[in-house]
């Protein structure tokens, strides 16, 4: 074999090795990109699709597009936020604005002397902030946006008063809890820590959001406001190892007669559900 043939064989062998190496690099990069996308950037559109490794360990980021009750809402998952392309490469839904005054419940303004005196007293003592009137007057700037690929979220550790469903009457402070939650969350971005999936295929979660006071645990805030009680179920209760906090703030709200604890006779959501099932 001549020197020229040997050189050609060497070049062909080197070229083949380079092609194989390049193919492996491209394949590896592609597989790595797919794995990274699935793990960090793939949108979750229902609770049953949440990967097992996320429960109790990782957080989901997204926008609240609908609040249907005092202890649950719908989350439009936006993994990676702006770095995941949301808002410039991937579309984020815009919620329709509510009516000009933003009030959910219309209340007649009465000139009753006693009512005016009572409200003045509540405002003077600071208890007005936890009264039914205060919560009903909260403004909600957006309307719910339905029919989206969203994850239904159930707030962990709490039960809010039941609203009117299937012909059943609403509990006191059911509307107040709904309005407060809409005022606090609707149209905003939140962090959600998945804990479990309940019988209705909702993701029971710890939910936090940012405001000028810092990060706030929404479930805990509802207990502090007197708009929810600590979850009464013996099974499937999720506290994310913070049950003592919820119990402490429930006792405090009860002692200070905040929200639903202002009533003379209390019927908890758990007691109400048992009653209507009979």
From Swiss-Prot:
Statement: the UniProt record of this protein carries the keyword Transmembrane helix: yes
Cellular localization per UniProt: Mitochondrion; Membrane
Catalytic EC class: hydrolase
EC number: 3.1.-.-
Keywords of the record: Calcium, Endonuclease, Hydrolase, Membrane, Metal-binding, Mitochondrion, Nuclease, Transmembrane, Transmembrane helix
Similarity annotation: Belongs to the LCL3 family.
CC terms in the record's Gene Ontology section: membrane; mitochondrion
Protein name: Probable endonuclease LCL3
Main location: mitochondrion
GO MF annotation, one: endonuclease activity
Lineage of origin: Eukaryota, Fungi, Dikarya, Ascomycota, Saccharomycotina
């Amino acid at each position: 074999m001549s020197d020229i043939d040997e050189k050609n064989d060497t070049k062909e062998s080197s070229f083949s090795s380079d092609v194989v190496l390049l193919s492996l690099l491209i394949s590896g990069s592609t597989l790595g990109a797919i794995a990274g996308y699935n793990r960090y950037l793939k949108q979750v559109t229902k609770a049953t699709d949440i990967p097992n490794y996320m429960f109790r360990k990782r957080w989901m980021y997204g926008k609240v597009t609908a609040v249907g009750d005092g202890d649950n809402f719908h989350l439009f998952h936006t993994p990676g936020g702006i770095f995941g392309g949301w808002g410039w490469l991937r579309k984020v839904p815009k919620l329709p604005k509510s009516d000009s005054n933003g009030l959910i419940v219309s209340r007649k303004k009465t000139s009753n002397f006693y009512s005016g005196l009572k409200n003045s007293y509540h405002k003077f003592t600071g208890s007005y902030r936890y009264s039914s009137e205060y919560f009903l007057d909260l403004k909600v700037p957006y309307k719910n946006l339905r029919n989206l690929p969203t994850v239904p979220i159930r707030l962990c550790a709490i039960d809010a008063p039941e609203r009117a469903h299937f012909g059943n009457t609403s509990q006191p402070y059911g509307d107040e809890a709904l309005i407060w939650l809409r005022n606090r969350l609707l149209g905003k971005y939140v962090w959600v820590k998945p804990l479990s999936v309940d019988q209705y295929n909702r993701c029971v979660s710890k939910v936090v959001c940012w405001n000028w006071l810092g990060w706030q645990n929404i479930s805990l805030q509802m207990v502090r406001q007197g708009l929810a009680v600590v979850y009464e179920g013996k099974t499937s209760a999720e506290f994310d190892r913070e049950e003592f906090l919820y119990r402490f703030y429930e006792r405090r709200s009860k002692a200070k007669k905040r929200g639903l604890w202002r009533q003379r006779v209390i019927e908890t959501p758990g007691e109400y559900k048992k009653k209507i099932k009979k």
